[in-house]
Amino acid sequence: MEKFQGYLEFDGARQQSFLYPLFFREYIYVLAYDHGLNRLNRNRSIFVENSDYEKKYSSLIVKRLIWRMYEQNRLIIPTTDLHKNPVLGHTNHLYYQMISVLFAVIVEIPFSLSLGFSFEGKQIKKSYNLQSIHSLFPFLEDKLSHFNYVLDVLIPYPIHLEILVQTLRYRVKDASSLHFFRFCLYEYGNWKNFDIKKKCILNPRFFLFLYNSHICEYESIFFFLRKRSSHLRSIAYEVFFERILFYGKIHHFFKVFVNNFPATLGLLKDPFLHYVRYHGKNILATKDTPLLMNKWKFYFLNFWQCYFSVWFPSQKVNINQLSKDNLEFLGYLSSLRLNPLVVRSQMLENSFLIDNIRIKFDSKIPISSIIGSLAKDKFCNVLGHPISKATWTDSSDSDILNRFVRICRKISHYYSGSSKKKNLYRIKYILRLCCVKTLARKHKSTVRAFLKRLGSVLLEEFLTGEDQVLSLIFPRSYYASKRLYRVRIWYLDILYLHDLVNHE
């Protein structure tokens, strides 16, 4: 990146207005190859002429593309010619992929420069403990106990490509680049809509950039509506849908309500609304009444249909009551458990009973989802019955055992925060018996005979690491008792989800 820094240091007035000429600079293609494709897709590069090139950068194919872009008539090729000449069709599909990657790199330049200017002179404090996934659950345990409802919204897509082009138009002021981008999408892509699940495999950087810009556009408007939620019942928010004058209308809207309605600013505004985006979903936790939650639901429906022109069925917005329904988040099923508590109180000669309800945060393991992930990876069948791992029988005994022990410890480490360990013990049982069946299959023996010979050694391998961790946290007398069955342990060294946990 430092090698090309001199090429990218143009003044602030030009960096947003003249991105189109960068498509005709060879060094940008080198930058895209080194910084993008070599990192995201190491096994396959669209800047390589063929496999005999030993995956080296080809300047010849870049020169051909630039020459075609200068000669606009040569860049436009009828669809009939693509079918008649498969070599030409493949080449133009390759050109389209190159342009899409390059567009993502070029448009990221003003975003990265503006982000760097915003953090210039500021010191960002780093807390490695807060990087752990488990650090979120103490926050949920503290906050969710005060909430009643959770709004679970599935972010709708596919979305029409023209909406994405208009979204980029608000941030990239170069009309030539946007016209060229639209031309490439409709000329070579021939798509009617945008579906990241189907197309992200072809070009991850490009489609992730489009998806993130789409989400950024949505959240920028939603956060404004959330801050001004006290006015939504009386004022239609369709007036904000033209984003060219969006910020001016925000300022005008704020002045009108501050001057004319100062007493109603906090009537319907919810200060306890928490928002998170996870796995293509929006999750809103609040202490509102069912009536206000239904209002938020219809606001979401109208918002997506009016602004993004996407049909959004009401079934994709679920209102869950935390005391009855579970919130699926980061591999756990979280809910609130109401524990009735009876307290006997006595004043002088009179005694009476007081009924209290204690709200407790409950985190459970989604056993059906985990068994589905185990069945998908051939550790068991769909009913949860362990089977042998046939693809691992060619490995050594120690390698097979270490693989199972490592998976078992990681899952046990991640799900140590569950309220009840019954489902965790079931997962361990599946992995242990799968390990035994795999080793027995390798040695062409029965499970019973193999356990008689090496059963104690297998149990020691599976249990030693877990006992060492627990002995550092609790005294021996405590973790050997039944109380450990109900203790939740949150670790601060978990930075990513295991594949079996990340089942969605």
UniProtKB/Swiss-Prot annotation:
Q: Give an example GO molecular function.
A: RNA binding
Please indicate if the UniProt record lists Lipid biosynthesis as a keyword: no
What subcellular locations does the record give?
Answer: Plastid, Chloroplast
Task: Provide the alphabetized UniProt keywords.
Answer: Chloroplast, mRNA processing, Plastid, RNA-binding, tRNA processing
- Renumbered to this chain, the signal peptide range is none
GO terms, biological process: mRNA processing; RNA splicing; tRNA processing
Source domain of life is Eukaryota
Predominant location = plastid
Name the Pfam families for this protein: Intron_maturas2, MatK_N
According to its record, what are the GO cellular component terms?
chloroplast
UniProt key word Repressor = no
Instruction: Explain the purpose of this protein.
Output: Usually encoded in the trnK tRNA gene intron. Probably assists in splicing its own and other chloroplast group II introns.
Query: Which family is this sequence assigned to?
Result: Belongs to the intron maturase 2 family. MatK subfamily.
> Would you tell me the protein name for this molecule?
Maturase K
Q: Please name the source species.
A: Draba nemorosa (Woodland whitlowgrass)
Q: Upper taxonomic classification of the species?
A: Eukaryota, Viridiplantae, Streptophyta, Embryophyta, Tracheophyta
